[in-house]
Amino acid sequence: MDFYSVKSQPFVRSPLVDQNPSIQNINEEVKRDIQNPLSYKTETSDKELCQTAACATSCSDWYPQQQTHMPHQNAFDSAKATAKMALPPTAFSNYCVKPSLTRNKDIPRTSIRVSKLRYWQRDYRLAFPNFIFYFDNVDEEIKRRVTQKINNLGAKVATLFTFEVTHFITTRTTDPEMCQPNDVLYLSKTANMKIWLLDKLLNRILFTLLNSDSLVNTSASCLQSLLDGEKVYGTSDKDFYVPSKNVEYFREYFLCIRDLSQYYKPIAVREWEKTLDSGEILWPSLAITAQGRCPFNTGRRRELKITKHNHPAHEIRKQLLSCTNQTNQNNVVKNSASVLVRQIMGDYNITESAVDGAKQMPTEFPKPENLLPVEKRAAMSPLNLLEPRLINKQNTLANQSPRQPPNAFDADPLAHKKVKIETKSGYCENCCERYKDLERHLGGKHHRRFAEKDENFQGLDDLFLLIRRPIRTN
């Protein structure tokens, strides 16, 4: 039950008020108001009661947020504030509203990080001369170099393991609790020594302590690295997929073997074009094969070898029939004329005379006067007066004429198939462009224009002069 809602209930005073000696330094009137705040009738100002500059609104946990209006409320609030300053803190003070910490957005995060590193460097430099290091399972050459750096910072390196060692440096990743009791790693764990890996000492402690200049020009180093990156990869605001002059993008299936350390240029680069017309795959593709077989061999060579000289029979038959029909059409005209001549002339053959004079002396015959024109004589010739029976016989003989051998044709049509020669593609560092055919690129105008200028190879000429074999003096 809230004591503010019941006026007849007296105010319960804390017994710590009487026991607190600081309450004796307050004026008698203020002390009376604190001990019994409901007994006064005269209004007292805040200036007389609260001389410690305490704010009454910060003590909202003393009373509920919603309360009825009471007389002399200002004096009562001031009395409560003074009493709270006199009393020790209680558990209710945790509910007070605390001011929130707002981050200053104007301070960049990089400056905060640099300032923290500077404090860390200062503290470690002051404490470093008190350190004693001991190296376990570390190479002697590395130990010698690290010892020199540690001595420059003022610390010491112990050659023998003692309990005066503060930092135990090792390369072993074994848990110290799993080691033998006589192992130095187990002893260092029991002695509460700092156990560091060698990588932590080199890359985190010594590197940060010795390279203090890297924190000074942080913005300058970032700007320089940004400029170097723009020279190689272009500006950062540019789209990466937009073609660049200094970068060659792969557009088809490619094979690129790079150096893992990125010290050397790519060892092998090959790109294959997509063939949309034919379904032939030019790039290497893995196939499911038996154990011990090459996964890149799909058996296409074996199929071509079998079908090279064993073509289907119906294709050869079509070729033979086409050649035979063309030959028969040419022979029909010749045979029909010869058959008609034999039927008319009988068994008579015209032969050349063996007399010499017959060849030299021309024979003249008198021309008849009633000679008809050629057109009329052709119409009255026996060829046009043949009976239908003779014409049918001629057609039968023409069809029964013996076949002649067809014209010669290639036994293997695939023997003259064009063989595709693979061109050698690559990248020309002189022209700064990528080529698909090396021979065509070397004969091009762009490459020859660069190769014909001697000033482009001035660096090589100077290098050859330096490495030239000296002439013998004798």
From Swiss-Prot:
Matches recorded under InterPro entries: BRCT_dom_sf, DBF4_BRCT, Regulatory_Dfp1/Him1, Replication_Regulatory_Kinase, Znf_DBF, Znf_DBF_sf
Keyword Cell cycle: no
Zn-finger (DBF4-type) residues: 421-470
Location of the BRCT domain: 125-178
Binding site for Zn(2+): 428, 431, 441, 447
Location in the cell: Nucleus
CC per GO annotation: cytosol; nucleoplasm; nucleus
GO biological process, one term: signal transduction
CDD domains the UniProt entry points to: BRCT
Keywords, comma-separated and alphabetical: Meiosis, Metal-binding, Nucleus, Sporulation, Zinc, Zinc-finger
Pfam families: DBF4_BRCT, Dfp1_Him1_M, zf-DBF
The UniProt record lists the keyword Membrane: no
MF GO annotations: nucleic acid binding; protein serine/threonine kinase activator activity; zinc ion binding
PANTHER family assigned: ACTIVATOR OF S-PHASE KINASE-RELATED, PROTEIN CHIFFON
Function (record text): May act as a kinase regulator. Essential for progression of meiosis II and sporulation.
Protein name: Sporulation-specific protein 6
